[in-house]
Amino acid sequence: MLLLLAAALPSLLWDGPPDTAATLRQAGIERIQVPAAQYESWKSAGGLAVEAAHPDGAIQLSSPGVQYRANVASATTTPWLVGNGWRILRNPRGRFIYDAPGAKAALAAAEASCFGADAAVHTDAAGLKPFAEIISMLRAIGPNGPPVADIGFIDDGSPAAGEVINLLVRDNLLVKLVAKPDPAMKLNVAFGSKEFPKEEAGNPPMMAHDIRGHLTDERRSLRIFGSAVVVARLTAAPDGVRVHLLNYAGAERKIDGLRVRVLGRYPKSHVTAAGSPADELLDYSVDTDATEFTIRELKTYAVIDLAR
Amino acid sequence: MPGPFPGRVVKVHSARSIDEESRAANPDAVRQMLTAGMLALTGEKRKEDAWRRFISPRDVVGIKVNCSGAPQICTHPEVVAGIVENLTAIGVPASQIWVYERFANQLNSVNYPRYLPDGVHVEAAEGEYSRGTVLGYDPRTYVETSFFGEDDTRSNLVRIAAERFTKIINVPNSKEHQAAGVTGCLKNIAYGNFSNVARSHKSSKTFTYSFIGTLAAVEPIRSRTVLQIMDALAGVWHAGPFSRFPQFRFYPKQLWFGTDPVAMDHQLLDLVEAKRKAEGAVSLFDRSPEHLGNNRDPNRNAFIREPGHIEYASRLGLGVFDAAKIQVREVEL
């Protein structure tokens, strides 16, 4: 089981020389991938599990974060998130590589885990400790269950559909890519159908908004209030659900207070948040059809396990 | 709201209330104006009895100031100090008085504590380094609506207003507002008490027409806001509420008193409209797209203004808008 979990955790892709091993250990790194050409020289480095990286065929992902573009005129003041969730959803069996310097290494690892990606994160010395903290957290919380989704999206693989999926993820509309309408979904969206024509995707935010309107906010399994830079996900758990909160601005700024609403009655909760002190959830309420709470502080990643 | 005096507005003028050069208020003149205004509003003979009509020593009192143009223009600390002086004089302990705003950077720029007795709290819902936080708001009291498709559709009430105060004294100042037309009693108690309200403006469109009254009508704000005191010592007739351009400030040298925010704001609308007319600026009610633009020009504005929000609020029962039914009493000191 531990081996399986370790295999599912994002790897650190490290191209420094073997004499950096002590730096890695000090930062809390236990396992690395190195370029195949350096593998032999790294084999003797003590205290680290070393594998040879095989980047061929891996999909390069963007360094996750926020682009505020304050000096650029645009149709919206909503910060632009650079997220890779939609690309991971489109390639569930893909292998991915992030190039994420500094504290963004933590966000990259959290994003990869949250979306279930087989990913390696290439970072620099400043990224080692944040990466190790997230890996430690991922180990502590254990594996995720299957994702919970409200929307089944029939993807035609086009760039336009990709952008719509990106915006659905970014707007916290829980989406699953399906080959045909899934009766378990609250809403099925066939991209290019009469109801959701391709021409509408010329304005992707409008199409995402239209999909949200068809679903309705009342039927959304998960909603968040208080930040425009957080992506939330939901995975199933044996006796409840797991809420994932990814702060895409986390490398620069923590969030003080985020309100979360989850459909369903969950009187029990447990929070795990990387880099934040263990904390109780605030203003916890369980109503007839939903559970709400406030997380006091969100750095890069937090997981809230809710149980019946 | 509208409280015991619907349609009644008392205006007290004192030529020595503020120095136009230094923008400093005269504490003695302000004290006299507060007393004259409260006596005229209530008909009482003693100022203590006038204040006791609204506040008792057991109350926890929130004084809602307006600092959105601070430090250039804001609720004058001398006015707040005068109100606190009267509250403590009728037995409200300083520790039961809060001066509050939404944003700490604006509130702190005024330095209210320097003017107030020890023990009075000065508190913002959102801290200097935590702008946008939800922690200062009550998660259970909110208005939920979508204006432009935003994902966060809630505007929550300031937590101390929801959980702590038994009475609120609303102390706005007299300003034009580039979205709402004017920002007076209604907007100060509405947008000044709820989170996530800037989402109601985008490009040249603003939903202030209905949102201001809707927020002001939310309980417990509506029933706990017992007194309106408009700080019209100084005002802004264009490019409000922030007042970056001193040429658009003016000095009515007045304090207004009432319990009806609609009647008070109708008076504010008339005041700002008259000043704009005197300055040759287009009406607040102008909706011409050609007047959209950089508001350094008094005939241009970023939004199509919605001064109709005041009449809309009257339809929610928040006060009297009909000019024929508003009784204005003017006091000259």
Language-model features, listed with the residues they occupy:
Chain A
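Solvent-exposed beta-hairpin/edge-strand motifs
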Residues: 259-279
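A glycine-rich, often tryptophan-bearing local segment used as a flexible ligand/cofactor-contacting loop or short
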Residues: 188-224
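Low-complexity, Gly/Pro
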Residues: 1-8, 250, 254, 301
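C-terminal beta-strand-rich structural cap/linker in extracellular carbohydrate-active enzymes
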Residues: 192, 287-308
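Glycan-processing catalytic domains of CAZymes
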Residues: 4-198, 292-293
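Extracellular/luminal ectodomains and secreted, surface-exposed scaffolds of diverse proteins
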Residues: 278-288
